[in-house]
Amino acid sequence: MKNQILNQKIEYLDQLIELLKIPSISADPKYDHAIKKAAHWIDKSLNEIGCDHVKIYQTPGHPVVYGEKIINKNAPTVLVYGHYDVQPPDPLELWTSPPFEPVIKKTNIHPEGAIFARGACDDKGQVFMHVKAFEQLIKKNKPKITKILTKNNHTNQ
């Protein structure tokens, strides 16, 4: 599986950067359109990797995205949870690059390079990583029952 992921590294980086460009700021209603765009991005990704059931659930707050792949109904369920929203990037003057224009930089802490963008670490990067790991498991017919739930972290739902 590691070799497969390494072979698709550039493709995966491009996809992650695409997701990170979406300013899905949950605390500001003027970004509600971006929250919906991010939810649809996750929905599309789950469908593309082969989930059997993918749905966007509308809530009084922001949408919840759910996807599952069931291969063996008798196996335990694994639930992967994450959120696709981000906090406002203020104060902007503390950013060395625009928060929704991801860049890969080498630093003393990350000599191999790291992505700098709002949401790269909390939590779009992790959601993306789980979707891609799930994709590899589906390709190898490995998941017994796996469910992915993503939501806006601040919907209070």
Summary of predicted features, one role per range:
Residues 34, 40, 46, 67, ...:
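Alpha-helix boundary/interfacial micro-motifs
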Residues 61-62, 153-157:
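Short, internal active-site loops enriched in acidic
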Residues 1-92:
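N-terminal helical capping/dimerization or prosegment-like subdomains
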Residues 75-155:
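Active-site metal-coordination/substrate-binding segment of hydrolases
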